[in-house]
């Protein structure tokens, strides 16, 4: 008994906080157990004369051990908390599925993390309903695709049965162009555009103004715009400016393009357009601009804001252009079209198709065919009286351009 009391005496100072703080007993008990297992003396019984004095407790070592254990326990608690929240979210989804609510059958880790970030229960239900609708649309599209493929195969088999052996052995003077050859030719045009083509900038600095669904819609329009530009006769040199690494835009683009992202024939940079080009050669295209675009300028650099705005936040791109002290222009929609309903904001793929047509032809009527017909009722028709007035003005201007007493003036008076 004497040996036991003598052994516990050095730890009396450590046992006092243990008795007062019962809530953290698991932490201090683990620390004491670790420290006692490493520092405790042997309990062998000796004679009173040969008994050595007990070892003194090293407070500095005990404090260091306790701090390290607190840090380890904190990290483990954070990881356990994340795992518990993921597990609870999966259980919640499974419970809602059993209750018959609109919940997707398969959900990715990224969608699961986005679901965990939802603040309220109603927000989680809305996001799960959105994923459910997206999954159903994907399945319906896949079924329709399979049905079309089966119909094509049946039509092909029927056509082969109807054709004779002589018709099957026909020779043609034209070589067949395979997809690989077409892609190589389009790639060469893209390389030439990067070296000598006119730049066209997509401003990617609007990811904070959009919801996740709006950002995904914007990236879809960017993919379609890049495809239209790549297949054009004289493509632009596309710039993705203000594209931050690991931003929402960058993650979504890499997710869509996958391994082709590093092979795209375009320039993606974190710099602003004013850092790459002189300000006097930049024109920011925005529907809120008071300046109407009259002709396409081949020596200018046009900027399009990558911004899908369903909440009608008007003036966002115009305010940014004013802050950067950049010239702005808008398309002459009211001059050529009988505008019916809706705002004058166009999608990114519609804008690039209009600009490509203007660049190649310079004809506004041909370029504005890409404006959706649901927004206007047709082109403005100039009346005969207006045409007669224009002709008179042209004649008057031509008459005044000659000197007095010239032959042309006398002939005109006669």
Curated annotation (Swiss-Prot):
Coiled coil region boundaries: 133-171
Catalytic activity: adenosine(9) in tRNA + S-adenosyl-L-methionine = N(1)-methyladenosine(9) in tRNA + S-adenosyl-L-homocysteine + H(+); guanosine(9) in tRNA + S-adenosyl-L-methionine = N(1)-methylguanosine(9) in tRNA + S-adenosyl-L-homocysteine + H(+); an adenosine in mRNA + S-adenosyl-L-methionine = an N(1)-methyladenosine in mRNA + S-adenosyl-L-homocysteine + H(+)
Gene Ontology BP annotations: mitochondrial RNA 5'-end processing; mitochondrial tRNA 3'-end processing; mitochondrial tRNA 5'-end processing; mitochondrial tRNA methylation; mitochondrial tRNA processing; mRNA processing; positive regulation of mitochondrial translation
Single Gene Ontology MF annotation: tRNA (adenine(9)-N1)-methyltransferase activity
Keywords: Coiled coil, Methyltransferase, Mitochondrion, Mitochondrion nucleoid, Phosphoprotein, S-adenosyl-L-methionine, Transferase, Transit peptide, tRNA processing
Residue ranges constituting the SAM-dependent MTase TRM10-type domain according to the UniProt record: 186-378
Subcellular compartments: Mitochondrion matrix, Mitochondrion nucleoid
Keyword Lipid biosynthesis: no
EC number: 2.1.1.-, 2.1.1.218, 2.1.1.221
Gene3D superfamilies, A to Z: 3.40.1280.30
Signal peptide: none
Residue numbers carrying Phosphoserine: 79
Transit peptide endpoints, chain numbering: 1-35
Subunit structure: Component of mitochondrial ribonuclease P, a complex composed of TRMT10C/MRPP1, HSD17B10/MRPP2 and PRORP/MRPP3. Interacts with HSD17B10/MRPP2; forming the MRPP1-MRPP2 subcomplex of the mitochondrial ribonuclease P complex. Interacts with GRSF1.
Functional note: Mitochondrial tRNA N(1)-methyltransferase involved in mitochondrial tRNA maturation. Component of mitochondrial ribonuclease P, a complex composed of TRMT10C/MRPP1, HSD17B10/MRPP2 and PRORP/MRPP3, which cleaves tRNA molecules in their 5'-ends. Together with HSD17B10/MRPP2, forms a subcomplex of the mitochondrial ribonuclease P, named MRPP1-MRPP2 subcomplex, which displays functions that are independent of the ribonuclease P activity.
Name assigned to this protein: tRNA methyltransferase 10 homolog C
């Amino acid at each position: 008994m004497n040996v036991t009391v003598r052994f516990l005496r050095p730890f009396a100072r450590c046992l006092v906080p243990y008795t007062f703080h019962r809530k953290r007993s698991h932490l201090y008990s683990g620390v004491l157990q670790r420290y006692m297992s490493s520092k405790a003396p042997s309990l062998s019984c000796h004679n009173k004369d040969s008994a050595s004095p007990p070892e003194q407790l090293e407070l500095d070592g005990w404090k260091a051990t306790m701090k390290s254990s607190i840090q380890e326990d904190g990290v483990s608690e954070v990881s356990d908390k994340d795992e518990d929240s993921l597990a609870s979210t999966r259980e919640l989804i499974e419970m809602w599925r059993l209750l018959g609510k609109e919940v997707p059958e398969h959900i990715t880790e990224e969608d699961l993390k986005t679901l965990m970030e939802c603040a309220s229960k109603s927000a989680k239900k809305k996001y799960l309903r959105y994923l459910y609708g997206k999954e159903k649309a994907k399945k319906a599209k896949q079924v329709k695709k399979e049905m079309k493929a089966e119909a094509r195969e049946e039509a092909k088999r029927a056509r082969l049965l109807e054709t004779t052996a002589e018709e099957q052995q026909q020779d043609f003077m034209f070589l067949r162009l395979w997809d690989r050859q077409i892609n190589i030719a389009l790639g060469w045009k893209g390389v030439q555009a990067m070296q000598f083509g006119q730049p066209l900038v997509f401003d990617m600095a609007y990811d904070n103004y959009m919801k996740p669904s709006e950002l995904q819609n914007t990236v879809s329009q960017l993919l379609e715009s890049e495809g239209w530009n790549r297949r054009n006769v004289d493509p632009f040199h596309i710039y993705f400016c203000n594209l931050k690494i690991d931003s929402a835009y960058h993650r979504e683009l890499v997710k869509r393009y996958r391994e082709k992202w590093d092979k795209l024939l375009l320039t993606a940079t974190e710099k602003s357009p004013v850092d790459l080009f002189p300000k006097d050669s930049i024109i920011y295209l925005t529907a809120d601009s008071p300046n109407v675009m009259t002709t396409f300028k081949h020596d200018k650099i046009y900027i399009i804001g990558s911004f899908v705005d369903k909440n009608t936040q008007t003036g966002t791109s115009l305010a940014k252009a004013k802050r950067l002290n950049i010239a702005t222009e808008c398309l002459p929609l009211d001059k050529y079209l009988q505008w019916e309903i809706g705002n004058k904001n166009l999608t990114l793929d519609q804008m690039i198709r209009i600009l490509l047509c203007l660049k190649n032809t310079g004809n506004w009527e041909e370029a504005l065919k890409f404006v959706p017909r649901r927004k206007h009722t047709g082109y403005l028709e100039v009346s005969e009286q207006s045409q007669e007035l224009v002709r008179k003005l042209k004649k008057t201007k031509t008459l005044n351009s000659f000197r007095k007493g010239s032959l042309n003036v006398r002939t005109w008076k006669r």
